[in-house]
Structures are given as structure tokens and as C-alpha cells.
Amino acid sequence: PMYVNAVTNLVNMVFNFLLIYPSRTVELLGRSFEIWGAGLGVAGAAWGTAIAFVVGFVLMVFAVCRNHLISPIGFPLKPNLEILLRVWKITLPNIMQRLVLCLGQISFTALITGLGTIPLAAHSIAITAEQAFYMPGSGFQAAATTLSGQALGAGDKDKLKKIISTAGRISVIVLTCTGFLLFLFPSVIMSVFTPDQEVIARGAEVLRLVSISEPFFGLTMVLEGAFNGMGDTKPSFYISLFTMWCLRILPAYICVKVFGLGLVAVWWCMVADVISRSMLLLARYLRGRWLKALK
């Protein structure tokens, strides 16, 4: 998957570069080069992304077929209804969670749009910058998902607990360090994306604020990954539904529409969502109800 994603992103960048902009002359090392471009604008971006996704799909299918452990070659095409029902039972809550979070993000951005151009620009850039700093947590989430599923299959309760505990602690430590960088150098980070001083100032303010939630987000990703690896996907959905809409969107709406507050207040609502989700998932883990999956 890492290699496929790398190729997909490279294809995406190349085709976006060629399809969005018109033909132009580029100066490099004192020489002029004519670079072809389709000049399609937004449509070019869509085509470039679509081509990249198709390339990624083909490469992933090829990789799956080459892997003797998961290759479908040689197996009958008749669907197994029992397996399909089990897959659907695990998948549906995860789909609903993604939908809840996606709609929540759209609603959250819509609220910020009403604050004006500068707050919206600061929000968009700060979100992009923050994503780069919590990226290590995604790796720990993938590890927790894979290893938890293996431990569950082996019926090893002690190993399962150790995997979750170890991955959770490392993720919290790493994201505490990245959060520390966000807190110390928010203006430097914002200046990488924009030269506008007002946007930098507003974005730096919220980046420093959100830095306190990074360790909690690291724990959230590991616990969600572990629960997903065990097939226990419903709790993550219910918790995300509650925290996103009751602790982020509703309070943010009240802050903006009722009290006329700005970007910082809205981001406090986001921080409350992240921390609360982490604590609720941790509470479920400590209660041990997920151990029923081993029985």
C-alpha cells in the first residue's frame, strides 16, 4: 500500500501539473523549456485525480493477485453469504462513522465560512498543517488494527492488551512531541503555506490551541484501530456521532450564531471533541467489554 500510494500521488501531481495549466515556458539552469499543458483548470484537476485513482486501483489489484496469501486467483467467484454478512456487520458502522465525520467537517467549515475570508483561510491552512503533524498517529493506528486482529485470531488476551497499551503509549508520546512543535513554532509552520501576515497570525493562534489535543488524538487513533481490528466497530461510530455533533458542531454553532464569537472559540469546540472522544474510547477500553470478542 505504501508504494501504491506513493505512485498514485506522483501520478496525481504530474497529471494535475499538465492538465490544469496551459502550455508555458519554464526557465531551469539558464535554459528555457516548453512544457505542454491542457489548460483545463478545475476540470484538469478532476481528470488528474481520476487518472491517479485508476492507476492506484490497477496497481493494488495487481499487488493483491501477486500475494499468495490473499490472491483470489483459483477461488470460485460464488459469494459466501455467511462471510458477506459478517463483513457487512463490521463494515456498516465504520461507513456510518466516516459519513458522520465527513458531514461534520463540512458543517464545521460552513460555520467558519461565515466568519470571513481571513478566518476561513487561516482555518484551512491550519488544518492542513496540523494533518502533517498527526500523520505518525495514522501509522500507529494501522499497526494497532493489524496486530490486534492477529492477537484476536490467536485468542491471546494478554498479547492483545500489550499491543494496545504499547501502541497507545508510543502514539501519545510521539504526538506529544509533534504537538510541542506546533505550540512552539506555529507562525513558522503557517508561513510555509502563506505569506499573508494576518492569516499567519490567526492560524498560529489556533495551531497553538490545537497542540494540546494532539496526544489525545494519538490515543484515539490507536484505540479506534484496535477496536476495528477486533471487529468491534459500533462503539467508535456511536462515540464519534456524539462528540462530533454534540460537542463540536452544536457548540460551534452557538458560539458563532448566538454569541458572535470567532475562530478561536470554534477551534475550542474542535479540541473538546477530540479530547472527549479519546476519553470515551479509553473508558470503554478500561471497562474491558471488548474482551467479549475473545470468547
State the predicted function of each range.
Residues F15-R24, R31-L40, L99-A132, Q150, ...:
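Helix-terminus/linker motif at the lipid-water interface of multi-pass membrane proteins
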Residues L10-L18, V61, I106-A110, A132, ...:
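Alpha-helical transmembrane segments of multipass membrane proteins
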Residues T8, A52-G56, M60, V64, ...:
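Transmembrane helical elements of multi-pass membrane transporters/channels
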Residues P1, T109, A122-P186, F217-S240:
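Small-residue-rich hydrophobic transmembrane alpha-helices
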Residues Y3, V7, P93-L101, A129, ...:
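Hydrophobic alpha-helical transmembrane segments of multipass membrane transporters and ion channels
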Residues E27-L92, S148-S213, C255-K295:
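Short alpha-helical transmembrane segments in multi-pass integral membrane proteins
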Residues F17, T49, F62, N94, ...:
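Transmembrane alpha-helix boundary and packing residues in multipass membrane permease domains
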Residues P1-N9, A45-M60, S138-Q141, V210-G229, ...:
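Short runs within selected transmembrane alpha-helices of multi-pass transporters and secretion channels
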